[in-house]
């Protein structure tokens, strides 16, 4: 999955260049300790004692379009169970509540590890999937888990012709 970057200009987050680690940000008039990272797309991770779909949706509707995130942002709330297990709920930019996310899983794991709360190898539980994440010494993140068939689509000729133009 690559490496996580916590640098504000790589996420991106407005303001001076800095690593966004355990920084306070306000969403919906409530301050949260946040860690932001890019794992190819932007993520906001909030450590909490309790997590739920309702809570991530409440925060996500504000954080997704907050002015400090010029490219919008995916939001994860996480609960660390122990040094090798964490739970996360995900709110994806442009999609809303999401049952599972590979990049969200990696961002959550990278944030928890960077905060010193987990070992480099951990299990991440999401509502529709459990993944194993390993953060190697060089920072590379490896994601392992099951995949499942979701569905299929048929694309019309107009759409496939447009793809050829790209």
Residue ranges: model-predicted function:
Residues 1-99, 109-166:
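Active-site proximal loop and beta-alpha junction motif in alpha/beta enzyme cores
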Residues 103-105:
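Helical hairpin unit composed of two closely spaced alpha helices linked by a short loop
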């Amino acid at each position: 999955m690559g490496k996580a970057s916590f640098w504000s200009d790589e996420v991106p987050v407005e303001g001076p260049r800095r690593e966004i680690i355990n920084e306070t940000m306000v969403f919906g008039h409530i301050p949260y300790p946040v860690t932001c990272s890019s794992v190819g797309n932007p993520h906001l991770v909030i450590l909490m004692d309790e997590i739920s779909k309702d809570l991530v949706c409440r925060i996500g509707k504000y954080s997704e379009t907050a002015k400090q995130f010029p490219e919008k942002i995916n939001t994860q709330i996480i609960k660390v169970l122990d040094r090798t297990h964490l739970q996360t709920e995900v709110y994806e930019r442009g999609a809303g509540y999401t049952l599972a996310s590979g990049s969200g899983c990696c961002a959550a794991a990278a944030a928890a590890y960077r905060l010193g709360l987990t070992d480099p190898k951990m299990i991440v539980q999401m509502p529709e999937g459990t993944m194993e994440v390993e953060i190697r010494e060089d920072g590379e993140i490896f994601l392992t888990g099951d995949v499942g068939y979701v569905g299929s689509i048929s694309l019309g000729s107009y759409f496939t012709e447009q793809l050829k133009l790209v």
